[in-house]
């Protein structure tokens, strides 16, 4: 069988997909977008007790250096354009984790006139972490779920 036959079956690209996705799962760099009390739990998850560095998660201060955004807390209408702007500054591929009831759907302030009822109305969300506020363990579980999602994606476009 010639190399053309191997390429047509997708063997080379699927192997490259697995390799690329494996390296991405071990080097997630989230950009912290802490808006309320959930940000304290996010900081707790990055501290010494839970140490998210062991999963390859290193918090970055700049959106240009990160590929994951963790939206933690209540998103107000005035902050929504800033959230979108920061999301647009992130390099592809990028993922979003919505952390807490307020970021997921408005939470306690759902019926307030100034609160966005879920950050998924502003940016596409990949993983939802429930809780008010969610524990550090829940955030770590969400990161592990994001790693599993990344492993299942196709990164190299194939011609149909």
Curated annotation (Swiss-Prot):
Q: Could you tell me the EC number(s) of this protein?
A: 7.1.1.-
**GO terms, biological process:** aerobic respiration; electron transport coupled proton transport
Protein name per UniProt: NADH-quinone oxidoreductase subunit B
Q: What does this protein do?
A: NDH-1 shuttles electrons from NADH, via FMN and iron-sulfur (Fe-S) centers, to quinones in the respiratory chain. Couples the redox reaction to proton translocation (for every two electrons transferred, four hydrogen ions are translocated across the cytoplasmic membrane), and thus conserves the redox energy in a proton gradient.
| Superkingdom as given in the UniProt entry | Bacteria
A GO cellular component term found in this entry reads: respiratory chain complex I
Quaternary structure per UniProt?
A: NDH-1 is composed of 14 different subunits. Subunits NuoB, C, D, E, F, and G constitute the peripheral sector of the complex.
- How is the cofactor bound here? Binds 1 [4Fe-4S] cluster.
Q: List the disulfide bonds.
A: none
Q: Which UniProt keywords apply?
A: 4Fe-4S, Cell inner membrane, Cell membrane, Iron, Iron-sulfur, Membrane, Metal-binding, NAD, Quinone, Translocase, Transport, Ubiquinone
- What catalytic reaction does the record list? a quinone + NADH + 5 H(+)(in) = a quinol + NAD(+) + 4 H(+)(out)
